Amino acid sequence: MKKLLSFVLAVAMLLSMASFAAAEEGNWKVAILTGTVSQGEEEFRAAEKAIATWGAEHIITDTYPDNFMSEMETTVSKIVGFAADPDVKAIVVCQAVPGTKAAFDKIKETRKDILLIAGTPQEDPDVISAAADVVMYADEIAQGDTIMETCANWGIDVLIHYSFPRHMAMELIVGRHTLMQQNAEALGIELVDVTAPDPTAEAGLSASQQFILEDVPQQMAKYAGKKVAFFTTNCGMQPSLQTAILDQPNAYYPQPCCPSPYHAFPATLGLELAVGGDDEAALKAIAAKLKDYDAVGRYSTWASPVAMTIIEIGVEYAKGYIDGTIEGRNDGAKLAELLQAKIPGAKVANYTNAEGTTFDNYYTVLLAPVDFNDYL
């Protein structure tokens, strides 16, 4: 009799657990915060794609302000607001602009159950990794090698580096710039720093874009007869930079700041590309259009949109955590497996800073630059 009673109780417990799991399966939500189309279309479209994939009943989205530096309280409020919904079990912020760390800290005071994921963070690694469960970013520093390798292959004489003080205070951007300087010196390339208007300042993005459109021709005149490559650290400046370079035979574009087939290329070249669709088809369409401008050998990027992938994998990882197939908050092996399945050839590593400190929940992703001649 006792054995039978024990068996009945065990079955009841299992049924109760199954019922709870079923409820979790039906009610779970992942919240995603991205930039707007003007500041980060890829992330915005990735959030839309997540809704299409998982359903609006499971994915909720919002955007942070374009002037996020002066409206940080709005960003914090939106992230914290997600946690007010008891069905939200994970939050993905990409780009993780300033305010993300403060919001995550606030959420952890009352909702320790929520998985917190930061993508493309604009707060330094030691800051954001202390607040987030998982951080993902394209490998900024290693791009100091890949960008300069591309420039060397092109026979570049001068590299113009556009940025502004806010970006040049960020650890990873500074690390990339330092490596670019070292490589430029070794390769005999002149690296020239040019300060552009910050698009989050009062004059806004349009002032930054206009500056680029006016400055590129001036730089080409200054370095007449030389091969000049241009790079800017800001997403919103990419369309202007690509456009300004297009009709300059000696101007080169090694990659966008967030390398991808979709980062400004569709707008610059007048292409109707499904952002985040068929990457190879997108690369072929870009190559064909660049050929019309005799510019196939003057542009490069990465073969896959890492920023979009961060959101896609962030949601997939979160779902695994919610349903229990991923047991820990920070499962590096599983995260690398998901990233490499989505982007074959991706190099995934933990970030280690200049002092030798490795952050075990901060993951960087690196791809090789493309040669558009391979897509003709």
Describe each region flagged by the PLM:
Residues A282-L376:
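Hinge/cleft segment of the Venus flytrap/periplasmic-binding protein
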Residues K106-E140:
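Flexible loop/hinge segments that line or gate small-molecule binding clefts
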